Amino acid sequence: MINAQDIKIGTAIRMDGKLYFCIDFLHVKPGKGNTFMRTKLKDVVNGYVLERRFNIGEKLEDVRVERRPHQYLYMEGADYIFMNQETFDQIPIAHDLINGVDFLLEGMVVDVVSDASTETVLFADVPVKVQMKITYTEPGLKGDTATNTLKPATVESGATVRVPLFINEGETIEIDTRDGSYVGRVKA
């Protein structure tokens, strides 16, 4: 059990039989009344974000989670097979438990988060920024730079990303996997 004032970003708590991760918090001390914590909690199972207010003295059930690096090996049926970098054990993870699955490549190292008490995989996080080569995009027209125009491009994982007109096929770009947005061109 932890006190509400001990909640930080990344803290895992169990509430109403569901597991939540804190993604944002604010310690509020109003001029009148008791101090409280305003939090944003993300449901691990379905990804819903819930705003919740806790009184400072309130006790919450904390969950100990482990974050370990795993390497993506291959796909088998509907599952993705990952290998633990420390023990070399292989585990299957379902498609819907992987954040940023569209940008997953063989050999990529991801963080697998699991419940420490039950060893159940909660989710896997692809790195926030990845570098990928563009496999197909339409050529940009010379002089078509009056506005910040974007065009679709397919990267080596098969995902489609919106990139600026000056990006050509064969170039390597950096992508933010949280929203699939173009970050920049990678210098060779």
Swiss-Prot record:
The keyword Protein biosynthesis applies. Its main location: cytoplasm. Pfam families: EFP, EFP_N, Elong-fact-P_C. This is Elongation factor P. It comes from Phocaeicola vulgatus (strain ATCC 8482 / DSM 1447 / JCM 5826 / CCUG 4940 / NBRC 14291 / NCTC 11154). The lineage of its organism: Bacteria, Pseudomonadati, Bacteroidota, Bacteroidia, Bacteroidales. Involved in peptide bond synthesis. Stimulates efficient translation and peptide-bond synthesis on native or reconstituted 70S ribosomes in vitro. Probably functions indirectly by altering the affinity of the ribosome for aminoacyl-tRNA, thus increasing their reactivity as acceptors for peptidyl transferase. It is found in: Cytoplasm. One of its GO terms (cellular component) is cytoplasm. GO terms for molecular function: translation elongation factor activity. Belongs to the elongation factor P family. Pathway: Protein biosynthesis; polypeptide chain elongation. Keywords: Cytoplasm, Elongation factor, Protein biosynthesis. InterPro entries: Elong-fact-P_C, NA-bd_OB-fold, Rib_uL2_dom2, Transl_elong_fac_P/YeiP, Transl_elong_KOW-like, Transl_elong_P/YeiP_cen, Transl_elong_P/YeiP_CS, Transl_elongation_fac_P. GO terms for biological process: peptide biosynthetic process. SUPFAM superfamilies: Nucleic acid-binding proteins (SSF50249), Translation proteins SH3-like domain (SSF50104). The gene is efp.
